[in-house]
């Protein structure tokens, strides 16, 4: 199975071209795969693809500086989740969205949140986009999809943020490596 895993240089190259990729974590951790793309490349077609083919929760991975500048608070002040995933309150763009759930609305919310000029008044809570705060130090501190998405975007010369979505099988179970390989060959090549 190792031959199906791309070297990090290839992943960074894909990210620099605005391409989506699958990030797989260790078997002893979550043993799951996420669709990942630098957030600046997450248009409505990407969001729709993630919703349709990933089927998991679509999240916005942000560094701590952006979380702070947007005034986002953590969803829980006493995080007791297994991997201490740092979800913030959900968000929506203040302007330009309808109900907030469409692929277009979520893409607009993401673009608004990651803009270099964005401020806390540009977004509202609750919403249909779920930010996650990456730990400072990235994957060297926490080996999670959140930190990897931010690190890879940064290494690719992109805005240091990513959009991630867990990949589930048709029956609602989590996709594991054999299924993730099939998803990659079917949709991302």
Regions found by a protein language model. Name each.
Residues 24-25, 61, 88-92, 133, ...:
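Short beta-strand segments
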Residues 43-102:
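Glycine-rich, N-terminal phosphate-binding loop and its surrounding beta-alpha-beta segment
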Residues 17-20, 31-33, 53-57, 83-86, ...:
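Short coil/turn connectors at secondary-structure junctions
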Residues 1-36:
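N-terminal glycine-/serine-/threonine-rich phosphate-binding loop
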Residues 130, 140-141, 145-175:
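Glycine-rich phosphate/pyrophosphate-binding loops
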Residues 78-137:
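Hydrophobic alpha-helical hairpins/lids featuring a short glycine-rich hinge
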């Amino acid at each position: 199975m190792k031959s199906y895993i791309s070297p990090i240089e290839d992943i960074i190259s894909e990210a620099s071209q605005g391409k989506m990729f699958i990030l797989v974590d260790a078997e002893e951790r979550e043993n799951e795969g996420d669709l990942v793309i630098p957030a600046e490349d997450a248009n409505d077609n990407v969001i729709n693809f993630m919703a349709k083919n990933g089927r998991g929760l679509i999240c916005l991975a942000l560094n701590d500086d952006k979380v702070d500048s947007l005034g986002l608070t953590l969803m829980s002040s006493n995080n007791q989740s297994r991997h201490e995933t740092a979800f913030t309150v959900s968000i929506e763009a203040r302007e330009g969205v309808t109900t907030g759930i469409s692929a277009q609305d979520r893409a607009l919310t993401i673009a608004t949140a990651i803009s270099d000029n964005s401020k806390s008044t540009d977004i509202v809570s609750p919403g249909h986009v779920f930010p996650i705060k990456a730990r400072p130090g990235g994957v060297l501190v926490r080996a999670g999809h959140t930190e990897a998405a931010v690190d890879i975007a940064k290494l690719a010369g992109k805005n240091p943020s990513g959009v991630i979505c867990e990949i589930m099988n048709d029956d609602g179970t989590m996709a594991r490596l054999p299924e993730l390989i099939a998803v990659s060959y079917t949709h991302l090549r």
